[in-house]
């Protein structure tokens, strides 16, 4: 039986303005693999995006309709099937364009590169290319909020033993991109694998072994066990 914390997400999602007064953020727990799909919207302009649509698409679209959002883009944090399986249906239902990293083998309308900035209404999403879990992995940042897909979880990181995975690349993604961000950066991952639904980079630096000070070789050895 699911615990009450997960039940509350199934019934209500997160429906609070976490970023600033004009922006809506919804973290939606979907499917049997504990995936998170995100709906983010400019409340004033009534436009938004969806990150990683997979299952429970009626639930996702209910959130969109309830907030009267015109979904402009679908972002994929990487090309694994459990983060992209809902792309086609959501695109058909909303007319949204699919955005993924330029190296992603999946069908996309727009190819994103490192440091690209995509504007949706007043919202500006910055793309960080963060290979390691997957060659085409990206993180998306708006204000102090970072959507990490399977690159970084609460309390852990994405596995690197799947096709396209590389512990060396993941180490570099952490060292050169994520660890350079402010400690107050809020982490929203691609799965509900941690003890908490979301975290901060400062907290993860202290408690997540993946971000502990260590050499690249030490990190590779840990990830290869």
Predicted regions and their residues:
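Hydrophobic residues in well-ordered beta-strands that form the structural core
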Residues: 51, 98-100, 148, 189
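Active-site HxH/HxHxD metal-binding segment of metal-dependent hydrolases
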Residues: 34, 45-48, 55-127, 206-210, ...
């Amino acid at each position: 039986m699911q615990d009450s914390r997960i039940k509350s997400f199934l019934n209500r999602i997160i429906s609070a303005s976490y970023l600033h007064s004009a922006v809506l953020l919804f973290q939606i727990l979907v499917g049997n693999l504990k995936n998170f799909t995100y709906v983010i919207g400019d409340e004033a302009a009534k436009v938004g995006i969806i990150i990683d649509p997979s299952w429970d698409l009626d639930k996702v679209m209910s959130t969109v309709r309830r907030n009267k959002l015109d979904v402009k883009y679908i972002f994929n944090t990487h090309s694994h099937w459990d983060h992209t399986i809902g792309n086609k249906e959501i695109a058909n239902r909303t007319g949204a364009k699919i955005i993924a990293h330029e190296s992603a083998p999946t069908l996309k309308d727009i190819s994103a590169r490192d440091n690209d900035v995509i504007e949706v209404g007043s919202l500006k999403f910055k793309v960080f290319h963060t290979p390691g879990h997957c060659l085409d992995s990206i993180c998306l940042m708006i204000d102090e909020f970072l959507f990490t897909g399977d690159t970084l979880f609460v309390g852990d990181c994405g596995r690197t033993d799947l096709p396209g995975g590389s512990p060396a690349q993941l180490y570099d993604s952490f060292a050169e991109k994520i660890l350079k961000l402010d400690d107050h950066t809020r982490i929203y991952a691609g799965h509900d694998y941690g003890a908490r639904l979301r975290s901060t980079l400062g907290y993860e630096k202290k408690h997540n072994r993946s971000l502990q000070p260590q050499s690249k070789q030490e990190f590779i050895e840990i990830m290869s066990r």
